[in-house]
Amino acid sequence: MTAPKPSKTHIGNHALHPETLMLNYGYDPQLSEGAVKPPVFLTSTFVFRTAEDGQDFFDFVSGRREPPEGTGAGLVYSRFNHPNSEIVEDRLSIYEKAEACILFS
């Protein structure tokens, strides 16, 4: 899982409940053509700028190397990570008040 995305946790002095936070947590519309709700990504593979970037991302996701400070591993292959899975993981971690969450089958 990548680091959870920052999200509003209060409105004024009122703390939002986990059920409310889950509605939008972990999703940035600016990264998906401005879609209000997360699209369903029907893909298993993702594009890299260069072959070297692809190799780096596979190394980061598989744990062979640590990604640079402040960056995530990036999207590589859906068996490792996937935009929809990351959103669900982020939202479940909020709901369960956990540091992180992982999906598997």
Give residue ranges: language-model regions.
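N-terminal glycine-rich, Lys/His-bearing helix-loop that initiates the first secondary-structure elements
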Residues: 1-69
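Conserved N-terminal alpha-helix of the aminotransferase class I/II PLP-enzyme fold
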Residues: 45, 50-105
